[in-house]
Amino acid sequence: MATNFLTKIFGSRNDRLLKQYRKTVARINAMEPDYEKLSDEALRGKTQEFKDRIAQGESLDALLPEAFAVVREGSKRIMKMRHFDVQLVGGMALHYGKIAEMRTGEGKTLTATLPVYLNALSGQGVHVVTVNDYLAGRDAQWMGRLYNFLGLTVGINLPQMPREEKQAAYQADITYGTNNEYGFDYLRDNMVYDARERVQRGLNYAIVDEVDSILIDEARTPLIISGQAEDHTALYVAMNKVVPLLVRQEGEADPRTGEGVTKPGDFTLDEKTHQVFLTEQGHENAERILASQGLIPEGASLYDPANITLVHHLYAALRANHLYHRDQHYVVQNGEIVIVDEFTGRLMAGRRWSEGLHQAVEAKEGVNIQAENQTLASITFQNYFRLYNKLSGMTGTADTEAYEFQEIYGLETVVIPPNRPSKRDDQLDRVYKTTREKYEAAIADIRECHERGQPVLVGTTSIENSEIIDELLNKAGLPHQVLNAKQHAREADIVAQAGRPGMITIATNMAGRGTDIVLGGNVEKAIAALEADESLSEAERAARVQELRAQWKLDHEKVTALGGLRIIATERHESRRIDNQLRGRSGRQGDPGSSRFYLSLDDQLMRIFAGDRVKAIMDRLKMPDGEAIEAGIVTRSIESAQRKVEARNFDIRKQLLEYDDVANDQRKVIYQQRNEILDAPDLGVLIDAMRDDCLADVVRQYVPAESVEEQWDLAGLEKALANDWQVSLALQKEVEGSDAITDEEILEKVQQAAREAFLAKVGQVGAENFTQFERMVLLQSFDTNWRDHLSALDYLRQGIHLRGYAQKQPKQEYKREAFELFRQLIDQVKNEVTRLMMTVQVQSSAQLDEATQAMEDRGEGISNVTYSSPTETGEVETVADAATAAQPAAAGVRVGRNDPCPCGSGKKYKQCHGKLA
């Protein structure tokens, strides 16, 4: 109450920001007459003038009014479009690192040119992020004319582009691309074995178009690059033999009394969640059995960090044998396990269960076990976009998620007022008892609109619902178009014409997004086709264009008189924001329009959250079949249900981020170390530090710190140094011939002897030649151990929730154990690198070059690379990299780094698809 009172007096934070921005708008408008007088050359010259002023220390904020005035003037000349005042306000919000909420049709693409130009002047690059390749290409081409006129370069970053083209795109002042491709490029840059193969040049400033879709809807699915992992075939077979030796417990133990178990056993099953859990007795038995088979040392625990993968394999084997049944969950066909869809009963050829379950089922059935794919690199959008020095975004609907943007990304949302007030009539929802009644009412409304010539856009939440409406409209004999967010370029053309008289268009939420629906249809494409037709004379062309414009004017006036575009939806999405996006497709820039949602008690959202309340109202009113309830209380109940779902989804995303932040901190350390290794001209200091650390650990096993001579095992130390590290030292003789020698002096002698042995080795081939070998050894060790670490974190994450039963905080336990695993990773890298450096025998520089090349080939020679990323429709898409696909064994073909790439580009493999590995 007090907050509302204060807001009325002082205005909201949004009002105060807009007031502040409008003062700057007045300054920009005052400059317009002067800039109009400039020649094209003088206007373009402003860009260099601004760059010089930045070089002399002037800030981008100080340049903003002049830079915005230049862009507006350039747009008037090149695009024949003048930025509205509200677009200048939106541009300021974007420049200051905020999210600009601008309604559909308010010209977000043109608004973005203002902050993009201003920030590109710094020379550090600007990334414009779109939801699909079509929009990236369209906007780069469309707005590129303006940037090029003003003297800036524009690049476009697309999937499967050769490395040289990607590097050129990132070197441009402004780069357009999709969120997935930017993320994958970042991951691939941190997998290269040559610094020259990196494509990105730093993450300076990003403007994310449809920011809600990218940073919220797709944030639950990480970007993952996978490849063929280490072969664990023998382990799957061994674990399959352990399972029959474990007995299932019958009955569930009461947590307070421990009663309820009718037959004690080693594991319990939860068939609802398809999970299996070992009992205390089961842990002991499993450890005993695994020790007897030599899989773990005697007396070792199943949950020792070293055995973490064994736990994963044991659980996979138990699930495969007790929860997944032949001819119910899968069938065996041609020696392969084929999954059966539990809902449709169809065979899902080519699909595989993850987390080693598929391999465990293969071991159970005795068929050929196919190698497991391993995560090579992964990152969530939350953590990728937080790497930018400055981030901003724009969308038609951000205000409902303003809290999440602030909480997760530190981004404030500014609601930009429309250029003209909206005339759209958002009608109350109509709720029917059954799905059949709902669809009948929706079809009747569509028919009515079609008969009077009013265009209709039917919005659905899924492809399945689109197909139902499609079938019903076919039966009703109503002509229509269906869009499912699959073919972006074609769908953009169809959506652009969705405002023509009598048009019926069915679209899922994402289909055709980013394209305006103009009342009367979009005539510009037809005009562009005429202007490109060289067979027409100038007079014919002009006459045809005039005809088209006259026809469009008639159509536009007709549709406007009929009430504009009608939006009909057959289901509420679980997010209010998605519903608002659908409504926002109508009533653009002050056009008329209307929207209505047709719902039923059978809809998922209604059934789970709001159904009982609405059903009670219907029963009280004794409503007959076919009658709908249409009341504010119902609409409010539904919106309340949506708020509950949004809150739940926010909690899921926040929890995902809290867990991923642990991996993210570690990822930053590994990637920073990796980049330093790639860029360092000399790696001697790093190698020396690793060797000293490693040998200190070895010495302390035999000569404890601050110990006396009687506690030392010098014979054991001499033997270990000679056998494992090839360091020969007569320590016992030295101690005998010395009056007093300390443990620190022993350590120094060992480290000095190792340093001399190593330098002698380097001296044989020269330090310069040895550096590249050191680089490959370090990179390969970091990469191999990092991949294993990612798998270990996955396994740890899967079972960490069980710590809650032991009255422990799962998140804290995860952080603690993940840190311990990371410490082990660093120790393992030190050991591996030092051992290899000390034991390698170098005869000549040619031999060393050969070894270096072999290591680089092995490091980059990952097979079956795949890229997993979220799609606009909410699914996860996995794309295989053709160049790294596994070859049939009989073929025996291995692509060398300098061989022609198998994709047929004519480039060397290492310069084409080889870099993707």
UniProtKB/Swiss-Prot annotation:
EC number(s) for this protein? 7.4.2.8
Give the binding site residues for ATP: 87, 105-109, 516
User: Cross-referenced CDD domains, in alphabetical order?
Assistant: DEXDc_SecA, SF2_C_secA
Please tell me whether the keyword Kinase is annotated for this protein.
no
The Swiss-Prot or TrEMBL record annotates one GO molecular function as: protein-exporting ATPase activity
Any one of the GO BP annotations:
protein import
Membrane topology of the entry: Peripheral membrane protein
For the keyword Coiled coil, the answer is: no
State where the protein is found. Answer: Cell inner membrane; Cytoplasm
Q: Which cofactor does it need?
A: Zn(2+)
A Gene Ontology cellular component where this protein is annotated is: cell envelope Sec protein transport complex
One matching Pfam family is SEC-C
What's its catalytic activity? ATP + H2O + cellular proteinSide 1 = ADP + phosphate + cellular proteinSide 2
Residues crossing the lipid bilayer are none
* Primary localisation category: membrane
Q: How does it assemble?
A: Monomer and homodimer. Part of the essential Sec protein translocation apparatus which comprises SecA, SecYEG and auxiliary proteins SecDF-YajC and YidC.
Reported function: Part of the Sec protein translocase complex. Interacts with the SecYEG preprotein conducting channel. Has a central role in coupling the hydrolysis of ATP to the transfer of proteins into and across the cell membrane, serving both as a receptor for the preprotein-SecB complex and as an ATP-driven molecular motor driving the stepwise translocation of polypeptide chains across the membrane.
To which protein family does this belong? Answer: Belongs to the SecA family.
Which NCBIfam families does this chain map to? PRK12904.1, secA
User: What is the protein name for this chain?
Assistant: Protein translocase subunit SecA
Organism per entry = Acidovorax ebreus (strain TPSY) (Diaphorobacter sp. (strain TPSY))
Q: What is the lineage of its organism?
A: Bacteria, Pseudomonadati, Pseudomonadota, Betaproteobacteria, Burkholderiales
Q: Which gene is transcribed and translated to give this protein?
A: secA
